[in-house]
Regions:
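Short amphipathic coiled-coil heptad-repeat segments
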Residues: 128-131, 135-164, 331-349
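Acidic/polar-enriched heptad-repeat coiled-coil alpha-helices
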Residues: 121-127, 131, 138, 316-317, ...
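Non-catalytic DNA-recognition/assembly elements of restriction-modification systems
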Residues: 108-116, 153-175, 301, 306
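Sequence-specific dsDNA recognition surfaces
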Residues: 1-30, 166-181, 195-226, 248-249
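Short, Lys/Arg- and Gly-enriched loop/turn segments at beta-strand edges
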Residues: 38-46, 235-242
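A short glycine-rich beta-alpha junction/loop motif
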Residues: 54-62, 71, 83-86, 90-117, ...
Length: 349
């Protein structure tokens, strides 16, 4: 659903306006006519609140309109997002690497059209859920900004003494393994790689590699470790890190990653800060290889302001409270999204 009165839409220059086009009317639908993912072929948006604006359907889209006045405003966008409709699209979409549909393909598909009163109720419910999801997204983003501001102001923008990461912790290199070491056996050693890391998040263990190779004792991840991407073809990804919250004693890291191990509770937030990112950037300058990389000394030589113990306790309490709120609000977001997905599967035939 796109609200033309409030959502930001792209504009085109007058000199590239096509000679022939059809302007959107209230309730018209735009379908994606091609995608590399069958789930996104015929992905649809319904346009609301046009208010006389000159809006056209863009490249690789199909402009749809209810010419028989069988539907109410707001219903079509959800009907065309339903599981029932997309099952039909996946069956008829053509292509190998890129899948596509044509206007003629829509003659082979259908959506349920209940009474207009029933359509209005369905649209009202799903619009309300979408608005709540949007509100939840804003709450989450605001909490992230608040946490980041506290880290920058109370942990990084302080004068006085400083300390190096090497003063309060150690660095451990990742495990080197060969392709033949990789296995499907989930009892084998779990390898965490760069794709499992993201600033401000815990290590994501959903897509991991299992290997028949035993890491050293120090290479086994422990709860509280910080996993760092040390080398990557994209310099923007070098230095990204995540906190390891598990105590499974079965996981290690790949050769392009490293472990920073410390008992200092502030470090995991310092390593999300702009000060940390600037030091990563400075360490990468002068490299001339195809792969941007850090070494252990680059991490251990990074410096940050030294915070008094009494002050640090109150900062820890505040940031942990924000992180708990983030966890709760992300969970609530997933529940709303799950509810919407369930309704899109069950309410349309």
């Amino acid at each position: 659903m796109v609200d033309a009165s409030s959502d930001l839409l792209p504009y085109i220059k007058e000199e590239v306006v096509p000679k022939s086009y059809t302007l959107f009317k209230e309730g018209d639908v735009s379908f994606a006519d091609a995608s590399e993912d069958t789930n996104d072929v015929a992905k649809a948006i319904e346009i609301l609140n046009c208010n006389g604006q000159q809006i056209v359907s863009g490249l690789h889209t199909i402009h749809g309109r209810d010419n028989t006045d069988q539907t109410v405003i707001g219903y079509k966008g959800y009907a065309f997002a339903s599981e029932s409709f997309h099952k039909q699209i996946r069956r008829i979409a053509q292509g190998t690497k890129v899948f596509s549909v044509s206007v003629r393909n829509f003659d082979e598909t259908y959506i349920g059209v209940p009474s207009k009163d029933e359509q209005a109720k369905i649209a009202k419910l799903l619009i309300a859920i979408d608005k709540r999801i949007a509100t939840q997204n804003k709450i989450i983003e605001d909490l992230k900004k608040l946490k980041s501001a506290i880290v920058e102001m109370l942990l990084c923008n302080q004068s006085g003494e400083s300390f190096k990461l090497g003063d309060v912790g150690c660095y451990v290199r990742g495990l080197t393994y060969d392709n033949e070491d990789v296995t499907e056996n989930k009892a084998a050693t779990i390898v965490i790689r760069a794709n499992n890391l993201n600033y401000g998040s815990h290590v994501d263990k959903r897509e991991v590699v299992y290997v028949n190779k035993t890491p050293t004792v120090s290479q086994i991840l422990r709860k509280g470790d910080i996993v760092i991407c040390m080398a990557n073809g994209s310099s923007a990804l070098v230095g990204k890190n995540s906190y390891y919250p598990f105590n499974d004693r079965q996981s290690t890291i790949g050769a392009f990653c490293g472990i920073y191990r410390t008992s200092n509770p502030l470090v995991k937030w310092l390593m999300q800060s702009q000060r940390y990112k600037r030091q990563v950037y400075q360490s990468l300058q002068g490299g001339n290889g195809a792969i941007a990389n850090l070494n252990g000394n680059d991490i251990l030589n990074m410096s940050f302001p030294l915070i008094e113990k009494e002050k640090s306790q109150s900062i820890i309490f505040t940031i942990e409270a924000i992180e708990k709120s983030l966890v709760a609000n992300k969970y609530l977001h997933r529940l709303y999204y799950t509810q919407k997905s369930y309704l899109l599967k069950q309410m349309f035939i």
